[in-house]
A protein has these predicted regions:
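Hydrophobic residue at the +6 position relative to the catalytic HRD Asp in the kinase catalytic loop
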Residues: 325-329
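Conserved beta3 strand of the Hanks-type protein kinase catalytic N-lobe
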Residues: 178-179, 322
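Residues on conserved beta-strands of the protein kinase catalytic domain
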Residues: 172, 184, 271-272, 338
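Long, charged, glycine-rich C-terminal linkers/tails
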Residues: 154-167, 252-273, 460-466
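N-terminal accessory/targeting segments that precede structured cores
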Residues: 1-174, 182-184, 194-224, 428, ...
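Conserved beta3-strand ATP-binding lysine motif
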Residues: 189-191
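Helix-rich C-lobe and terminal helical cap/extension of kinase-like folds
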Residues: 86, 90, 117, 227, ...
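ATP-dependent phospho-/nucleotidyl transfer catalytic cores
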Residues: 129-136, 148, 196-204, 211-318, ...
Length: 563
């Protein structure tokens, strides 16, 4: 019997053309302003935006047809359906990769944003992860006009020199090296003059396209993606807020001897211009540079994980874009290197109750406490998907005995469980989780990618997260200004010292349980045991233990310095 002719449903056809036409026209009218002296430039930008929108519509329409036609008639839980779905995912990801490369700008940032979403199909994340946010720099005449508009017509008098050749150019801004009258080297981040208009145009198009897909396929609940992305890029356009974020992060790590955060020069900072202290360095995953300066990549990776573990579990204030280009390694300083943290445009402040619950979740994951993991998953809203939290964060199943790895049998069980999950399960899971959880997932995915490139053990992440989760669970959130006042801070300091001591004991207890869990005869598990043994007795040896205990007693001076 010949196959039935394929009739593309009318709902699919009308949805794509009606909603995307609405997206383009509304974006056009929203940005029209014929009375502006720059009306001609705006008109050209709008035409360019419509061309970009047309490419996006074409890519989405082709993808919808591909999914509809390729999966038609296949039983949802069959091996053929899964195999075909993977093929369609890959074709669609490659289609969107071409779209992002053609449209550049915010489409590249959107592709990178999607690639960092850990729970999306791997075909999308692996394909789109190749995107690079690099563009050809604008002529300095254009940049000079932005500087004059923001810093005044005589802005050049504030500098000894400004290098007209940018040291970096991305989709939103480019950066120039300069020297102040005082001799201080600075980096000037200058926003492109047309970028805000383009952002509104592109994000509006992305939102309407996502609405189109949600209408066609109600089971795919990914409308949160463009909304989250739009909020993220919108915050990136406010350089004043970026400066405030930078200062708050610097305050949080004021006692850290390894982390460097550029100082902000407020008298030369506006919404479109950010002037900051200039640092040199190389990307954190540049292994050739680390070898050249004689620094062990494992030490660098550990410092990176400690930095972000403290952000997540203790401060609850997280840098939202920790890709290697935003974290430089600079020679000198403690242990022979320092970490320079750049680009503070996007931060996430965690709800305090969520932060405490997430600390407990990580403790439960480390201890393989399945009951507590399921209970906390229910609190987060994961429901039946709570059993997959260990897979997401530790790469083990809810039934795994050890957090350091899985047996061959457990791997087979996990493989079968994951086979039963459908694409709509992923979208339902992501929609049900709180925004704080999604933010941590994204940051954690970027960090894991970096340490994987550095070729260091994933146990560094596991142990570091566990250490700070335990501390963050017990550590009281102290107001830094209150702590700086003499006499009034004594109670808080004593309480913090006691809780720090208790958390140290609990951390050692968890480490020992992980160590015992890795105590068996297989070569791979013996290797895990040796690594953990080294971590416990070499990294946290007797001298360091005394240091920790002394730190607990004298936390008054470490956390709450008197003025």
């Amino acid at each position: 019997m010949p196959p039935k002719p394929f009739n593309f449903p009318a709902k699919r056809t009308t949805a794509i053309f009606l909603l995307t036409t609405t997206a383009a026209s509304s974006a056009f009218t929203a940005n029209s302003d014929d009375s502006s002296p720059h009306a001609a430039d705006k008109f050209r930008a709008q035409i360019h935006g419509i061309v970009r929108t047309a490419r996006a519509v074409s890519a989405v329409a082709s993808t919808v047809v591909d999914y509809e036609f390729s999966l038609r008639g296949l039983p949802k839980h069959s091996d053929q359906y899964r195999k075909t779905s993977s093929q369609v995912h890959l074709r669609s990801a490659e289609r969107f990769l071409k779209l992002c490369e053609a449209n550049k700008g915010f489409y590249v940032k959107a592709g990178q944003f999607i690639a960092s979403q850990k729970v999306l199909p791997t075909e999308y994340s692996s394909t789109l992860s190749s995107l690079q946010d690099q563009v050809a720099p604008l002529p300095f005449k254009v940049i000079e006009k932005v500087l004059k508009d923001n810093l005044g017509p005589d802005f050049s008098k504030k500098f000894l020199s400004i290098d007209e050749r940018p040291i970096g150019a991305a989709s939103i801004a480019q950066v120039h090296h300069a020297v102040l009258k005082s001799g201080q080297e600075v980096a000037i981040k200058v926003q492109y003059p047309w970028i805000e208009q383009q952002m509104h145009f592109d994000t509006r198009t992305m939102y309407f396209l996502s609405k189109t897909i949600a209408w066609i396929y109600p089971q795919y609940r990914f409308e949160w993606l463009p909304l989250t992305f739009a909020k993220t890029v919108s915050s990136e356009l406010d350089f004043v807020q970026e400066g405030r974020n930078s200062e708050r992060a610097a305050e949080n790590f004021r006692n850290n001897k390894i982390v460097r955060i550029p100082h902000i020069f407020w008298e030369m900072t506006t919404r479109q211009v950010l002037t900051m202290q200039y640092y040199t360095g190389h990307k954190i995953d540049d292994l050739d540079f680390l070898s050249e300066i004689g620094v062990n990549p494992e030490k660098v990776a550990k410092s990176l994980m400690e930095l972000f573990a403290e952000m997540i579990f203790v401060h609850g204030y997280i840098h939202g874009d920790p890709h290697p280009g935003n974290i430089l390694v600079s020679p000198g300083g403690r242990n022979g290197f320092s970490l320079v943290l750049l680009d503070h445009a996007v931060y996430r402040e965690l709800d305090e109750e969520f932060r405490k619950d997430f600390c407990q979740l990580w403790e439960a994951l480390a201890l393989k406490d399945s009951k507590k993991t399921m209970w906390l998953g229910e609190r987060f809203g994961a429901g039946k998907y709570s059993r997959y939290l260990p897979i997401i964060f530790t790469g083990t199943t809810i039934e795994s005995k050890y957090s350091s790895g899985m047996s061959i049998k457990e791997k087979e069980i996990m493989k079968q469980e994951l086979k039963s999950l459908m694409f709509e399960d992923l979208s339902l899971f992501m929609e049900s989780m709180p925004p704080d959880f999604i933010a941590i997932l994204r940051v954690d995915a970027l960090l894991r990618s970096t340490i994987r490139k550095m070729d260091v053990s994933r146990l560094i992440r596991l142990l570091t997260y566990t250490k700070y989760a335990v501390y963050g669970h017990f550590h009281p959130k102290l107001d830094s200004e209150l702590c700086k006042r003499p006499k009034t801070n004594f109670y808080f300091a004593v309480k913090a010292a006691f809780l720090s001591f208790i958390s140290t004991l609990k951390y050692f207890h968890i480490l020992i349980k992980i160590l015992i869990g890795a105590n068996n005869s297989t070569p791979w598990q013996q290797k895990v045991k040796n690594l953990l043994h080294n971590y416990l007795y070499r990294k946290i040896g007797s001298s360091d233990l005394w240091s920790i205990l002394v730190h607990s007693v004298f936390l008054l001076f470490c956390i709450c310095p008197a003025t």
